[in-house]
Amino acid sequence: MAPPASTASSADPSKPTAQKLTEESDEKTLRKYFSTKVDDAQQKVADKSQNVRRLQAQRNELNTKVRMLKEELQQLHEQGSYVGEVSKAMDKKKVLVKVHPEGKYVVDVDKSIDINSLNTGARVALRADSYALHKLLPNKVDPLVSLMMVEKVPDSTYEMVGGLDKQIKEIKEVIELPVKHPELFDALGIAQPKGVLLFGPPGTGKTLLARAVAHHTECTFIRVSGSELVQKFIGEGARMVRELFVMAREHAPSIIFMDEIDSIGSSRVEGSSGGDSEVQRTMLELLNQLDGFEATKNIKVIMATNRIDILDPALLRPGRIDRKIEFPAPDEKARADILKIHSRKMNLMRGINMAKIAEQIPGASGAEVKSVCTEAGMFALRERRIHVTQEDFEMAVGKVMQKDSEKNMSIKKLWK
């Protein structure tokens, strides 16, 4: 009888290989499963870390608010302070302060305040119990007054002002020269001019020249209209004038331009009504600020009006207004210069005679000459052209100067 076959020899040789593949497949599945779990756990950790950082930021913000509220609560628990005005410094640790309406006191200065920063007229806070000076306060300025300060300097230059060479020279001497070179006046031993009055018919370039001065002097420019200083309640206009000069002193050197000054600077007459009395109070405060007890060395005032005949003589006297500059209607040469300035950027046809156009507008102001250029461009636009001709200027002259110029126009041009 034959012996039984061996088990190793009778088994299928492919079975160990299949088992090995199964084990590898299971290992890959487990590796992929745990890798996914690890990625999910890392994502959760990242989210939690982000939440922790967000909560820490919120905690810091809340701690800041709590600290500010504690400081505010502590200030509310403290006694109130008196507001005073520094008269003068007595020594390194004491100053003379005027408290309204009680009087003047010599007070101690807190260690945290520099004695050199306490200038005459500065607003300060005094402790209610010891009258010690513990805080330097900013000057009180009405928001309406602070808005009068021109933040952006106008882009007008002297080259944009035509036919006013004499006026430009005079205003440079009075306004620009003292601001840029005050040492020249000190060397000569003469007082600097304080103010200048620009007067003349409407549209002759008074405001334009003031804008050019603001551009070239490179100092603080404050623009105010006279009608803005006429207020409803008693004393409001005078207070605004006072705060206007306070703000000008803070930002010195500065220039104050008062347009339409005749609205508050008219001559005083007897038997005026209540409204006129308030206007007169405003003018009296202006007179005091121009030539009062306090010096205004670094403040220059430019006033403009077209009614110099109704201004008060007290406003026009030397010491307040040191120079009066007249702006007459431009002559023929000045009108030609103004036409060249305003037509500089226009697309003109060749051969346009500006001198001939200037001859056709006798007595025109600078504003009317500028209007001629604008109307000439409108006539060209009406005919769908991108260039301006001599005929456009002649028709613009007829329209601006209100002449009967229909005979010079064709029916086609009138109704096209």
UniProtKB/Swiss-Prot annotation:
Annotated localization: Cytoplasm; Nucleus
InterPro entries: 26S_Proteasome_ATPase, AAA+_ATPase, AAA_lid_3, ATPase_AAA_core, ATPase_AAA_CS, NA-bd_OB-fold, P-loop_NTPase, Prot_ATP_ID_OB_2nd
Record-given protein name: 26S proteasome regulatory subunit 8
Chaperone keyword on record: no
Entry superkingdom: Eukaryota
Compositional bias ranges of the Low complexity kind: 1-18
Region (Disordered): 1-29
Record: residues binding ATP: 200-207
Pfam family, one: Prot_ATP_ID_OB_C
Site label Mediates interaction with elt-2, positions: 206
Role summary: Component of the 26S proteasome, a multiprotein complex involved in the ATP-dependent degradation of ubiquitinated proteins. This complex plays a key role in the maintenance of protein homeostasis by removing misfolded or damaged proteins, which could impair cellular functions, and by removing proteins whose functions are no longer required. Therefore, the proteasome participates in numerous cellular processes, including cell cycle progression, apoptosis, or DNA damage repair.
One biological process term in Gene Ontology: proteasome-mediated ubiquitin-dependent protein catabolic process
Family: Belongs to the AAA ATPase family.
Keyword Nucleus: yes
GO molecular-function term, one example from the UniProt record: ATP hydrolysis activity
Coiled coil: none
Phenotype upon gene inactivation: RNAi-mediated knockdown at the L4 stage of larval development inhibits activity of the proteasome. RNAi-mediated knockdown at the L4 larval stage also results in increased mortality and transcription of immune genes containing the elt-2 binding motif when exposed to Gram-negative bacteria such as P.aeruginosa. RNAi-mediated knockdown at this stage, furthermore, prevents the recovery of P.aeruginosa infected animals treated with the antibiotic streptomycin.
Assembly and oligomerization: Component of the 19S proteasome regulatory particle complex. The 26S proteasome consists of a 20S core particle (CP) and two 19S regulatory subunits (RP). Interacts with elt-2.
Record Gene3D superfamilies: 1.10.8.60, Nucleic acid-binding proteins, P-loop containing nucleotide triphosphate hydrolases
Swiss-Prot/TrEMBL keywords: ATP-binding, Cytoplasm, Nucleotide-binding, Nucleus, Proteasome, Transcription, Transcription regulation
One GO CC annotation: proteasome regulatory particle, base subcomplex
Gene (name only): rpt-6
